[in-house]
Design a protein with these regions (language model features):
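Residues on the lipid-exposed face of transmembrane beta-strands in outer-membrane beta-barrel proteins
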Residues: 111-117, 127, 166-171, 224-228, ...
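N-terminal periplasmic/intermembrane-space "pro-region" immediately following the signal or transit peptide
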Residues: 2-4, 8, 17, 34-128, ...
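Transmembrane beta-strands of outer-membrane beta-barrel pores
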Residues: 83-89, 131-135, 173, 184-186, ...
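Repeated loop/turn-to-beta-strand initiation elements of outer-membrane beta-barrel proteins
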Residues: 75, 123-125, 175-178, 232-235, ...
């Protein structure tokens, strides 16, 4: 009876999430349709009335936030209803190992509810809950989308770990901040996660993921987070008993790499493949042993020191952490009717991260054609000791009877500089050259934490420019991001990613965006080159209350 009740509750919960997904999608379509009709067909007076009505459209604030805060003194309530839809521009076809019979990359609706209760001036309890549903997995005939069979969180959130996103108690004074509970910590400011490494990440969007997504895609952990403020120096210490691994775009996800064997037909009908117990060589893969909070030796620890001297701020970081992705170590051999095979044990190994960051702001005067030009310079770097890489060269030797475990350790470095310019007419320009390096790299080496992809080094000079349209009172904004990817000594150019975004502030509560993303250049086995048929357009709508 209890099991039947639980199934009924689960069924109702899924139906509610489906309804939430459809609601977000319809709301998005309605708002964009109304805006289009208003701009193109309606008289100015009609559009003005529509805008005035939309400016005060805040049912969540009126009927939820304000009502609850009146009933419970000391309670603060806020929320966000967001919807993202991304559609492929190329036709349905098999690409590499992928059965790409779908044309929707995501159709996600996310409801975020944030509650905070202030016990006193210094003491506050905060809860942030996430309710997500991705309708892309409901599309009929999509044999290529089956990741929800492996992990249902790709489709919707229903367990405590995902729904209870953050839950912490904070005590703050002018000299001390102490936050205990489940939380995310953002140490970096740049696109590329250079020192932003405290939390694992949900990488379901693969190369489409950008800095604007980090707040939503980080995976919070249970920890104690304390900061002490001196006059011009602050010391931040993290004690983290918890461990969370990365979520990667594996089999059956829209962004599963076309280079990842075997084909989808093999995987989606095999429990061994769905559970990750076998590979294309027929090897046996054991259960992954994760760090556990009950073992003090498994806990993680991080320290950050920041200092300020006028317009210059700088910081040093150290993080004694675990790998976010397990490396498959060879631990045995066996034979069957198909031949000799290996026994692999995925393990998370310890890492030592050493990082540095700096910011400097100034105004360049007398710039020709510009006048005064505000500039911000940023730098971030992370050096990682003993990152684990799958070593396919050694793995081949082991298969031939040689020694080794198929994994090798390499130090890695990733660093970036950013130059931010605030030109007249509110034009913002950012140039961010980014660099990734794997020490002692050789042919046949896979990927590892912080290292280059497919080569010894990678170089990605990111260029960003944005400008508002003044005729819309700066409510309409356009931006362009260009990310070419170079590497050496072998691959050279690995392709480029181009992102064009047009956003509009419908009201103080509602924002919408249209996004075009293009992947071009490089070879079919390169970082961006493999996704050259994943060009897409996206629509985003966000309502905050």
């Amino acid at each position: 009876m209890i099991g039947f009740s639980a199934r009924m509750q689960s069924t109702r919960f899924v139906k509610q999430l489906k309804y939430l997904g459809r609601l977000g999608y319809l709301a998005q379509a309605l708002i964009f349709s109304l805006m289009t009709v208003g701009v193109v067909n309606a008289e100015e007076s009609h559009f003005a009335r529509f805008e005035r009505g939309l400016a005060t459209f805040d049912p969540g604030g009126k009927y939820i936030t304000q009502a609850l805060e009146r009933q419970v003194p000391g309670l603060n309530v806020s929320g966000t209803l967001s919807h993202w839809s991304d559609f492929l521009l190329s036709g349905e076809e098999n690409i590499g190992f992928r059965d790409r019979d779908f044309d929707v990359l995501q159709m996600q609706t996310l409801l975020e509810v944030a509650l905070s209760y202030r016990f006193s001036t210094n003491l506050e309890l905060t809860s942030i809950s996430h309710f997500l549903y991705d309708s892309a997995y409901d599309m009929g005939g999509n044999d290529g989308l089956y990741a929800d069979k492996i992990d249902d969180s790709f489709r919707y959130y229903r367990d405590f770990e995902r729904v209870a996103r953050e839950l912490y108690l904070s005590y703050r004074t002018s000299a001390v901040d102490l936050v205990v509970g489940k939380q995310q910590v953002a140490w970096g400011k740049m696109d590329g996660q250079f020192i932003d490494v405290i939390n694992a990440m949900d990488f379901r969007e693969s190369v489409q993921l950008e800095a604007s997504d980090y707040e939503t895609r980080r995976l919070p952990m249970w920890m104690a987070n304390g900061t002490y403020y001196f006059k011009d120096v602050s010391l931040n210490v993290l004690w983290i008993p918890d461990f969370v691994a990365n979520v990667n775009p594996g089999y059956g996800t829209p962004w599963s790499s076309p280079l990842l064997p075997p084909d989808d037909t093999t995987v989606r009908h095999s429990d061994l493949w769905l559970k990750g117990r076998v590979n294309v060589a027929g090897d046996k893969i054991l259960q992954t042993d994760k760090p556990h909070w009950q073992n003090i030796s498994d806990h993680q620890m991080a320290v950050r020191l920041d200092a300020a001297a006028g317009a210059l701020t700088w910081g040093l970081v150290y993080y004694y952490a675990w790998e976010r992705d397990a490396a498959p170590f060879v631990v045995g051999r066996f034979s069957d009717i198909s031949g000799d095979h290996l026994v692999l044990e995925p393990r998370y190994e310890r890492l030592h991260h050493f990082g540095a960051t700096a910011d400097y702001a100034w105004v360049a005067t007398g710039v020709p054609g510009v006048g005064n030009l505000p500039i911000v310079f940023r730098a971030e770097a992370l050096y990682t000791r003993d990152a684990q890489f799958v070593d396919y060269r050694n793995l081949g030797e082991v298969r031939a009877g040689g020694e080794g475990d198929g994994v090798s350790e390499h130090d890695t470095l990733r660093a970036a500089l950013a130059f931010e310019f605030a030109f007249p007419d509110k034009i913002s320009v950012i140039f961010q050259p980014s660099f990734y390096y794997t020490d002692d790299w050789h042919e046949g080496l896979g990927t590892g934490f912080g290292g280059a992809i497919g080569d010894r080094w990678n170089f990605a000079p990111v260029f960003f420019i944005s400008r508002p349209v003044h005729g819309t009172r700066d409510r309409l904004k356009t931006s362009l991001t260009l990310t070419p990817y170079f590497s050496g000594p072998n691959r050279g150019y690995q392709g480029s990613k181009t992102k064009l975004m047009v956003s509009y502030e419908f009201s103080p509560f509602i924002n919408g965006s249209f996004i075009y993303t293009d992947y071009s250049g490089g070879n079919d086995d390169d970082l961006f080159g493999q996704y050259h048929q994943w060009d897409n357009v996206g629509f985003e709508l966000k309502y905050e209350f």
